UniProtKB/Swiss-Prot annotation:
Keywords carried by this UniProt record: Oxidoreductase
Ranges for region Disordered: 66-90
Organism encoding this protein: Lactuca sativa (Garden lettuce)
E.C. number: 1.8.4.11
This protein's name: Peptide methionine sulfoxide reductase
Length: 259
């Protein structure tokens, strides 16, 4: 038996919200018909029947349900594992790439002709609204990525893949240089079947070229969590030391990644 308590002084069926009136046939009112505020007696008793799940659903929506921390965690994971539902500008497309620390990766893509916007963030994990500290804990399964917005008429997806391969070593698992952790893994996260096909074919070609196993994961793009403003266009803004690096299209200056 489920019990619903109330502190309302003079509650009657006529004053109940519509959702509760609709289930009044499943409720039995305790006597007396009104209670002092200090009463601890149950106003309603809810007996199990075939419609009990529906009733409990309504009660849950009204804030009187029995959600557990596990339920909330599952909901958050479902959101984080859902698709990226952001919409690019008209005539533009999105692509996501993970290739180590996202500071240097973003600058590399900023320089690609046809790229109109870049953002760094977190994706592929289980935690909703993660922070940088969450990511660095190694417990959320997120990857540091750059989400690229580009004009497919001015920049092919293959051009983005070329930039991706050139920027990092895709044969080292969960590591790029001194940066170690699952957040630094190599990954291509696609939005369309065409992107997926191009990524798989490019990976096969690159593996033959290197004659080593390429560990790059190729997965559907999931919800993108924009990183803190501090990380956005980090090297272009000068980083910690204020040494700005060029974002000019086609620039081939070495990218110096510093904290």
């Amino acid at each position: 038996m489920f019990l619903l308590r109330t502190t309302t002084a003079t509650t009657t069926p006529a004053s109940l919200p519509l959702p509760l009136l609709s289930i009044s046939s499943h409720l039995s009112l305790s006597k007396p018909s009104s209670f002092p505020v200090t009463s601890t007696k149950p106003l309603f008793t809810l007996r199990h029947s075939s419609s009990t799940p529906k009733i409990m659903s309504w009660l849950g929506r009204l804030g009187x349900g029995t959600r557990t921390p596990a339920d909330a965690s599952m909901d958050q994971s479902s959101i984080a594992q859902g698709p990226d539902d952001d919409i690019p500008a008209p005539g533009q497309q999105f692509a996501q790439f993970g290739a180590g620390c996202f500071w240097g990766v973003e600058l590399a893509f900023q320089r690609v002709p046809g790229v109109s916007k870049t953002e760094v963030g977190y994706t592929q994990g289980f935690l909703h609204n993660p922070t940088y500290n969450d990511i660095c804990s190694g417990t959320t399964n997120h990857s540091e990525v750059v989400r690229v917005q580009y004009d497919p008429k001015a920049c092919s997806f293959d051009s983005l893949l070329d930039c991706f391969w050139e920027r990092h070593d895709p044969t080292t698992l969960n590591r790029q240089g001194n940066d170690v952790g699952t957040q630094y893994r190599s990954g291509i996260y696609f939005y369309t079947p065409e992107q997926e096909k191009a990524a798989i074919e490019a990976k096969e070609r690159h593996q033959k070229k290197l004659n080593r196993t390429v560990v790059t994961e190729i997965l559907p793009a999931k919800k993108f969590y924009r990183a803190e403003e501090y990380h956005q266009q980090y090297l272009a803004k000068g980083g910690r030391f204020g040494f700005r690096q060029s974002t000019e299209k086609g620039c081939n200056d070495p990218i110096r990644c510093y904290g």
